[in-house]
């Protein structure tokens, strides 16, 4: 009954939102040290385990193995067993993150293809599909798991890679995951799953005014973290590009273009679908660096009622800095904008000026001469989305922005 109630709790949390964390209490964790008592989890949310497992339970399912085995622990020490059904057809990854970074967590991942998995395990009839028994790495916060960039399915003990290779899974496949805190301890850990799809994006890069082809460096970047996912170049004659990349399901990405004598561009790739591999075809027109040309920085946004920029703005800021560093004669006007004027025009004017000045100060701090920079606020007079009553959160964020105008080049 306790296991059924715990599973229902997880289902309720799932329907409240995929981003919600699920907390697993110490009692539940300590009752799951055997395969037969594995906790059934939803491998979508972030799972927070308040305590580490204590002991190996009533049965020592994994034992008498060689310390050099790439498949198994030598024996269980302090284990917790989890089981789950895969929600997608995808490449599955996960991170096991200890609260105390001195802890050494190992894991084995089994695919359950028979009805009596735990019994077969006791008779050594089951081999894991992934394992990582490496020594913890304090420099990497002792994290382990499956990673999209890892190369090996099985990692033995000793000083070895922290991640094992991502696993291709199909929806509704059933898996058992056993996690072992080798040397013990009370502090807990978190478990975060992510799922990747193979994606393709192709298109053409052109001059905004002449439609002529542009040779450009092309980058796929996570909209959440700014992490670079893939990189390629467009054809110097046709401007065409074709790029494969692996995208996390339910995350957005930016396609970035960087071309000589042109502004960079940032194109949002819509929320990643859960369907099979798909291809996106884009036509991107980029403005040339010339007097009176304007660039809208859709990713350089601010917190509401604040001139503090969002963390997601940092990659755009760095691109703007590189643009100024690589074009020493470029002089720009930084325009600040607000989402409406709820505090009045005077307050909105001050806020928009502060936003523009924040970007100017960032560039000066990083070596751009102040003589090349002018900042100005435009209050709420140039909102991209002026309908305040119906604006979505995304549209409101787009209004809280800066734009760049070329004064001289």
Which stretches of residues belong to each language-model region?
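Acidic, Ser/Thr/Pro-rich low-complexity intrinsically disordered segments
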Residues: 20-31, 60-174, 180-185, 194-197, ...
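A short, Gly/Thr-enriched small/hydrophobic beta-strand-prone motif that recurs across taxa
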Residues: 91-93, 195-208, 294-299
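Structural motif
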Residues: 204-216, 221-223
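Short, acidic Ser/Thr/Gly-rich low-complexity loop/linker segments typical of extracellular
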Residues: 224-242
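A short, solvent-exposed loop/turn motif at the edges and junctions
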Residues: 245-272
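Extracellular beta-sheet/turn segments enriched in Thr/Pro/Gly and aliphatic residues
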Residues: 267-294, 298
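Periplasmic peptidoglycan-binding/anchoring modules of Gram-negative envelope and division proteins
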Residues: 302-336, 364, 404-409
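Periplasmic OmpA-like peptidoglycan-binding domain that tethers envelope proteins to the cell wall
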Residues: 337-409
């Amino acid at each position: 009954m306790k296991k059924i109630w715990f599973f229902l709790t997880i289902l309720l949390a799932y329907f409240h939102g995929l981003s919600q964390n699920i907390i697993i209490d110490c009692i539940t964790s300590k009752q799951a040290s055997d395969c037969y008592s594995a906790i059934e989890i939803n491998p979508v949310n972030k799972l927070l385990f308040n305590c580490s497992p204590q002991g190996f339970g009533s049965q020592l399912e994994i034992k008498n193995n060689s310390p050099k085995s790439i498949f198994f622990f030598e024996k269980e020490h302090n284990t917790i067993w989890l089981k789950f059904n895969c929600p997608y057809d995808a490449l599955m990854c996960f991170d096991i993150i200890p609260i105390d970074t001195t802890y050494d967590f190992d894991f084995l991942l089994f695919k359950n293809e028979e009805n009596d998995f735990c019994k077969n395990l006791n008779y050594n009839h089951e081999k894991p599909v992934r394992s990582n028994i490496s020594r913890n790495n304090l420099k990497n916060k002792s994290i382990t798991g499956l990673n999209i960039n890892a190369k090996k399915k099985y990692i033995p003990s000793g000083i070895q890679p922290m991640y094992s290779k991502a696993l291709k899974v199909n929806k509704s496949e059933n898996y058992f995951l056993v996690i072992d805190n080798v040397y013990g301890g009370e502090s807990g850990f978190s478990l975060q799953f992510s799922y990747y799809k193979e994606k393709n994006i192709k298109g053409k890069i052109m001059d905004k005014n002449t439609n002529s082809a542009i040779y450009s460096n092309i980058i796929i970047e996570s909209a959440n973290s700014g992490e670079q996912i893939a990189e390629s170049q467009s054809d110097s004659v046709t401007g065409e590009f074709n790029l494969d990349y692996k995208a996390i399901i339910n995350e957005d990405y930016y396609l970035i273009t960087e071309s000589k004598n042109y502004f960079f561009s940032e194109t949002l790739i819509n929320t990643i679908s859960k369907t099979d591999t798909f291809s996106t075809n884009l036509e991107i027109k980029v403005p040339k660096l010339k007097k009176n040309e304007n660039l809208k920085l859709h990713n350089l946004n601010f917190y509401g009622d604040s001139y503090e920029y969002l963390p997601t703005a940092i990659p755009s800021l760095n691109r703007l800095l590189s643009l100024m560093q690589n074009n020493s004669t470029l002089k720009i006007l930084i325009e600040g904008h607000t989402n409406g004027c709820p505090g009045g025009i005077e307050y909105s004017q001050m806020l928009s000026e502060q936003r523009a000045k924040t970007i100017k100060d960032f560039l000066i701090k990083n070596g751009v001469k102040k003589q090349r920079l002018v900042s100005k606020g435009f209050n709420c007079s140039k909102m991209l989305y002026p309908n305040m009553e119906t604006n979505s959160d995304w549209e409101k964020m787009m209004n809280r922005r800066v734009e760049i105008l070329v004064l001289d080049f």
